[in-house]
Amino acid sequence: MEGFLSHQPWWRTGVPTEIIRSREGVGELLHRLEREKKNPFFVVDSVLRDQSVFSPLLGQKALYLFDASASEPKTGDVDTVVSIMKSGSKAYDVVVGIGGGGTMDLAKAVGICLANPGPAHAYQGYGLGMNKGADIWVLPTLSGTGAEITPIAVLRGPEKKLGINNPYTAPSVAVIDPGLTSGVR
């Protein structure tokens, strides 16, 4: 790092994400959603379905279980979730991603694509899809990816693996529960 920083006249970073640290992450997330009168749509890593700590979330009607074991989310996954969300009678105002980096990236991309017409692969790149979509909230279950604060959603598209990169892709809220990230789940 010293070599990199020695060539920079300044170094600044900004994180637009509100970070909430709680040992009761799931409860804190649900309480906050209720308190703010949000209509959430949950994107949850399917590996979490058998863990009792997530039972209150899995009872939600607006839920998409994502199999994150394969690889990064695909642009087709984003299009599927957007279609599900738009076909319902509810207007969802927040997409909640719960899981590892791939699941959070899927939720982030869905949040952007809800407000921008066309397929998700059209927004892979920098500064595309600049209409702000639904709020994006995340609850990571794996530490180290950084997806909970970054303005990038990495997707595997029909022709390339590339991120959706714009200021609205960063989650507005991240609930960090150290108990959920203490081991790979």
Describe each PLM feature range.
Residues 115-185:
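A glycine/threonine-rich phosphate-anchoring loop and its flanking beta-alpha core
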Residues 1-94:
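ATP/NTP phosphate-donor binding region
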Residues 63, 110, 170:
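N-terminal loops that bind phosphate or other acidic moieties
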Residues 105-118:
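DPxDG-like acidic metal-binding loop motif
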Residues 101:
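Acidic-aromatic/histidine active-site loop/patch
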Residues 51-54, 106-108, 148-149:
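Short glycine-/acidic-enriched loop or helix-start segments at secondary-structure transitions
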Residues 59, 83, 113, 153-156:
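Short, hinge-like loop/turn segments at secondary-structure boundaries
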Residues 18, 40-41, 93-96, 135-140, ...:
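Structural motif
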